[in-house]
């Protein structure tokens, strides 16, 4: 399955919530009309079955983190093998992705922009260039912008947007040096309450 490159608002409208896929001066408010579904009959949002509700939740989380179907299934299998709550393990695996950590630190305005920075070899982990967006960041890892990319305007704009919305507590960032430390894996209570990971567990348990 190829990565979706169409209108970002269409995905948010389909899920009925802002997936924060877009950036810009209006980053602190929803830029999409999420009250109606996409298409000419968008106002008619039908009632979902139990399976449909579970599937929509999986698709929502997958799109928030920008993960393909096969990747997401792999994360679920890994989460189910670990001790503790499978749903919480799943979210933590997604949060530890390098593209997500770059976004959380404020170096990219969106996760998609963060993936692009990584693919263009603008990101280092512990001093080594890493160009794999799915790379799993570990506690204590230092994530930084490479020297040659530090003066990019989009990085300065992303840091400004991050300062407006507030940076998460599990990363520590030096905005002058454009580097940060992944201090801890976030607990479930630190993450969005808009995600119901139990629905995803129920879906995969069928």
Curated annotation (Swiss-Prot):
Recorded GO MF terms: rRNA binding; structural constituent of ribosome
Swiss-Prot/TrEMBL keywords: Ribonucleoprotein, Ribosomal protein, RNA-binding, rRNA-binding
GO cellular component, one term: small ribosomal subunit
Biological processes annotated in GO: ribosomal small subunit biogenesis; translation
PROSITE patterns reported in the protein's UniProt record: RIBOSOMAL_S4, S4
Pfam family, one: Ribosomal_S4
UniProt xrefs under InterPro entries: Ribosomal_uS4 (IPR022801), Ribosomal_uS4_bac-type (IPR005709), Ribosomal_uS4_CS (IPR018079), Ribosomal_uS4_N (IPR001912), S4_RNA-bd (IPR002942), S4_RNA-bd_sf (IPR036986)
Domain S4 RNA-binding: 96-156
Function: One of the primary rRNA binding proteins, it binds directly to 16S rRNA where it nucleates assembly of the body of the 30S subunit. With S5 and S12 plays an important role in translational accuracy.
Assembly information from the UniProt record: Part of the 30S ribosomal subunit. Contacts protein S5. The interaction surface between S4 and S5 is involved in control of translational fidelity.
Family: Belongs to the universal ribosomal protein uS4 family.
Protein name: Small ribosomal subunit protein uS4
Organism the protein comes from: Azotobacter vinelandii (strain DJ / ATCC BAA-1303)
Lineage: Bacteria, Pseudomonadati, Pseudomonadota, Gammaproteobacteria, Pseudomonadales
């Amino acid at each position: 399955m190829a990565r979706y490159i169409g209108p970002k608002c269409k995905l948010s409208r389909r899920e009925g919530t802002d997936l924060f896929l877009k950036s810009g001066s209006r980053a602190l408010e929803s830029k999409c009309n999420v009250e109606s579904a996409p298409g000419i009959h968008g106002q008619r949002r039908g009632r979902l079955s139990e399976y449909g509700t579970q599937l929509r939740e999986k698709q929502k989380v997958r799109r928030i983190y920008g993960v393909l179907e096969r990747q997401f299934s792999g994360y679920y299998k890994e989460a189910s093998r670990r001790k503790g709550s499978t749903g919480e393990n799943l979210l933590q695996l997604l949060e530890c992705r390098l593209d997500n950590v770059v976004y959380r630190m404020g170096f990219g305005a969106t996760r998609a922009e963060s993936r692009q920075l990584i693919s263009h070899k603008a990101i280092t982990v512990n001093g080594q260039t890493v160009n794999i967006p799915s790379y799993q960041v570990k506690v204590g890892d230092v994530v930084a912008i490479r020297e040659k990319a530090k003066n990019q305007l989009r990085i300065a704009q992303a840091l400004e947007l991050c300062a407006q919305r507030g940076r998460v507590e599990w990363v520590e960032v030096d905005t002058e040096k454009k580097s940060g430390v992944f201090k801890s894996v976030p607990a479930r209570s630190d993450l969005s309450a808009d995600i119901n990971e139990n629905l995803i567990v129920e879906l995969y348990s069928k």
